[in-house]
From Swiss-Prot:
It catalyses: (E)-isoeugenol + O2 = vanillin + acetaldehyde. Keywords: Iron, Metal-binding, Monooxygenase, Oxidoreductase. Inhibited by HgCl(2), AgNO(3), CuCl(2), phenylhydrazine, 8-hydroxyquinoline, R-cycloserine and p-chloromercuribenzoic acid. It is an enzyme of class 1 (oxidoreductase). This is Isoeugenol monooxygenase. It comes from the Bacteria. Belongs to the carotenoid oxygenase family. Coiled coil: none annotated. Optimum pH is 9.0. GO terms for molecular function: carotenoid dioxygenase activity; metal ion binding; monooxygenase activity. Monomer. Its cofactor is Fe(2+).
Amino acid sequence: MATFDRNDPQLAGTMFPTRIEANVFDLEIEGEIPRAINGSFFRNTPEPQVTTQPFHTFIDGDGLASAFHFEDGQVDFVSRWVCTPRFEAERSARKSLFGMYRNPFTDDPSVEGIDRTVANTSIITHHGKVLAAKEDGLPYELDPQTLETRGRYDYKGQVTSHTHTAHPKFDPQTGEMLLFGSAAKGERTLDMAYYIVDRYGKVTHETWFKQPYGAFMHDFAVTRNWSIFPIMPATNSLERLKAKQPIYMWEPERGSYIGVLPRRGQGKDIRWFRAPALWVFHVVNAWEEGNRILIDLMESEILPFPFPNSQNLPFDPSKAVPRLTRWEIDLNSGNDEMKRTQLHEYFAEMPIMDFRFALQDHRYAYMGVDDPRRPLAHQQAEKIFAYNSLGVWDNHRKDYELWFTGKMSAAQEPAFVPRSPDAPEGDGYLLSVVGRLDEDRSDLVILDTQCLAAGPVATVKLPFRLRAALHGCWQSKN
């Protein structure tokens, strides 16, 4: 029998498991769905299907994919488990068999050699495929309508990396997808693999290189001519794994390395810039101005997850606050330094943009924001996954426009839908799941980006609660 400790901070509030597979036809709607919204809003959520082990972490739950399917003003909802070999093994045993996060030395002997990924972090759509991905393994292909699992996906044998980022980048001009694999030859390796995939699913470029030290890597940045790889001091260690300790340790004395690689370059061509110890989970966008690379991203002083640190200091939440920041890398400089500028002080994460304008100087970005002037319905452990507001960042005004979700509500990562294929940048709608914590259920809100603070133009009402998701995407029917 599954049991979940409601006093566990990682199982509280928006993060309490729901474990619901559902197929809900014709959802209730308040307001009117804009005509532009025809397609699917995909999401991926970590959900523990069985009782968690004492040392569990939220980000290690099984993948539970979901989709809101929009057609002609009507909305249907579906959610399905991502049926990985790990999921199937634990379902058969009716108990947890896999141990600490990304540490195979803590697993039950019966699952030795089984793919450990839970494919729980993002949904990727490209070359007609819908993929559930997590960075510790290859993605799993899903049926675009039913979300039933079709199997592990290696691009028909073209991707030999053991791992695949949950945050590939897309070139709106060429239709290419760019991706990397970190610890690409296994958890204990420094190897990085980098691929470019054309719009038809063919790998057109591949190269490999080594990290300066073994590190947790979640996201990267791409411009027209460059790919940028941030290596930050959340380090991994074979010795720690064998000692059955957490895989990562925060080692600020190592500093950070920022690798800049020509977009179709070879691993030997990478140039390393340096920065102090810092952490970046998510990149907004990157572009070039002459010989400079500019990157907007969410930067914090330390890794926001409480892994051990080399100074044996307690976890400090005040240093784990992600803030919108701009990096500037001068490729003509004679040194390895870069410039970093904080753009705003508010806690903000899960950024997206109008991806039609990716890889160029953009004006708008969209994200979850904790407005300090408003009450929070969520707790410390839920930060990064839930927010009291949704925000539009304007690079011209250098400020946010915010919509407050409500005293007992919390928003999740948004998705952007343009008003029309040729609409100006940022002219469209934001979609976000909002947890109504006092009602134990969720809504999907639709906000007009031209008047965000006015509130939803339509609300899709679910009869149950959705757990805090990690990432999703919008896929138009066209």
